[in-house]
Amino acid sequence: MTSGRTGILGGSFDPIHYGHLAIAEEVRVLLRLNRVLIIPAREQPLKPGGSVASPAHRLAMARLACADNPFFEVSRIEIDRPDPSYTSVTLQLLHEQGLNDLYLILGIDSVADLPRWREVRRILELAHIVGVARPGAAVDLSHLSQVLPQLPARLIEIDGPRLDISSTDLRQRVAQGRPIRYQTPDAVVAYIEANGLYR
């Protein structure tokens, strides 16, 4: 894996959709990143209930969705680990692979939740935090500087694109027999149909 300015976008991606891809591209362009790693989680510690589709299906959908963007790279670094997908561990592993200029892309609501994350101070040592705000949504982060005094120097806030798409909604639409085309790439739609996912 080559070094350089690298964005990290993790998530369940259950399924991946244009909202995820648009955020990754927006951050890549604005911050002049060399690439963005899309990292499907095996199991997210702060999201009880787990994913609906298997790790293998979610990885395959992410690869299909990112196939036409040379700046996106899908990583199986969390899928291959048996333990929960702790961000601090993932960043440490990437650091050990020679990636020293990391930009962790999070929704601004997740930034507000950082004090609950495992080894959050180590996360801030290993990566810049890119907080992506939903247009029109205000989240107060002023309290975080008291709990995490190093955060303001590591935080980059940007406004995200206006795309109101959620994986939960896509799963519900599939279950109801409603279309999801134009909300996720056609290759992902075809994969979901071919594998009978979310029915």
UniProtKB/Swiss-Prot annotation:
One of the GO biological process terms: NAD biosynthetic process
Catalytic activity: nicotinate beta-D-ribonucleotide + ATP + H(+) = deamido-NAD(+) + diphosphate
UniProt key word NAD: yes
Pathway: Cofactor biosynthesis; NAD(+) biosynthesis; deamido-NAD(+) from nicotinate D-ribonucleotide: step 1/1
Superkingdom: Bacteria
Record keyword ATP-binding present: yes
EC number(s) per entry: 2.7.7.18
One Gene Ontology MF term: nicotinate-nucleotide adenylyltransferase activity
InterPro entries: Cyt_trans-like, NadD/NMNAT, Rossmann-like_a/b/a_fold
Keywords, comma-separated and alphabetical: ATP-binding, NAD, Nucleotide-binding, Nucleotidyltransferase, Pyridine nucleotide biosynthesis, Transferase
HAMAP family per UniProt: NaMN_adenylyltr
Family (UniProt): Belongs to the NadD family.
Annotated function: Catalyzes the reversible adenylation of nicotinate mononucleotide (NaMN) to nicotinic acid adenine dinucleotide (NaAD).
Protein name: Probable nicotinate-nucleotide adenylyltransferase
